[in-house]
Amino acid sequence: MNNIAVITGSNGMDAKTLTHFLLSKGYKVILTYRRNSFFDEGNIKKHFIKDLMDNPNAELHLEVCDISCQNSVVECIKSILKRHSRIDELYLLAANSHVGESFKNKELSIQTNGMSVYYFLECLKNNSPKTKTYFAATSELVGGTESGAFNENDKWNPKSPYAIGKALGARWIDFYRNSIDSNLFCCYGILFNHSNIYRSKDFAIRKITNTAAKIALGKEKELKLGHLEWARDEHWSDFGCEAMWKMLQLKSPENFVVGNGETHWGEEYVENAFSFFNINWRDYVKFDDSLKRPNEVVRLIADPINAKEKLGWIQNRISFKTHINLMCKYDYELESGMNPERPNVFSL
């Protein structure tokens, strides 16, 4: 019998990545999406044709859900239960995920990143209390550290509406896990920066690798960035999604910090990307103050010791240089009009 997993945020990087992972394990995956003029069911399903061919017992379904509306959440969960009888695992990955944009619509960030968690957990308490739930929190909760690394016991200091919304969502997880009248199996993961070829070009790492590829092909003349005085702890998203799944396989729910524990400054990102194409980045990178984020978080580094001990998390399964190279290679092939394959990092 297939395990049944519901994943919110069908267009997002982690939702696509986790769907690949779960289909490879023979899951029945139900992706939720918000009905709008930009949604293309065929465009979503095309990513998973090979997974479904390789795993004939796996299934993929789509379900409408507006996570910012409680009635829509309830209708979605009840519809899934009616059609598929149960929900074994729920992954709350949908979010208003661009930190800079969250300053322009603070209320939406709180609604989608925080209150949506309440909507789902309250619905599960009343309709599917045995469902195990994972919520994607964020390293932006940290607010940055001048030195050292962040673990599960450190204090939060959210500096953006995005992070404040995620903080609210995480508190709802703790409340419903520990509440006498619910006692749900629910947890959150604080995944530090992670990316793969599904990362949007609105994010720094993909903007850097994609623009470097375009410059190498003569399709762009420069890369505009706000600045490079920031440091992040970057891992490949496939490994982070595996950690999400492992959290829900534990006997008791627990929150985890996930990351490589390595510091990489902005200059390292551009240096590695442009070096892949044998280009001097200083000739092409321009700085524009209008691209700087308000309340910029300078340094975000993880201490994943708990994940190592309890989830079998392995730090630095691929090097930072390999990470950047894989994205650069993919972007070069993509911008060359080829049909590049998604890297199978588990085989590296």
Predicted regions and their residues:
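N-terminal Rossmann-like NAD(P)+-binding domain of SDR-like oxidoreductases, especially those catalyzing
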Residues: 1-194, 330-331, 344-348
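C-terminal "lid/loop" region of Rossmann-like NAD(P)-dependent oxidoreductases
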Residues: 223, 227, 254-256, 264-271, ...
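Core catalytic loop region at the nicotinamide-binding pocket of NAD(P)H-dependent oxidoreductases
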Residues: 186, 219-223, 244-258, 283, ...
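NAD(P)-dependent short-chain dehydrogenase/reductase
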Residues: 147-149, 161, 171-248, 262-263, ...
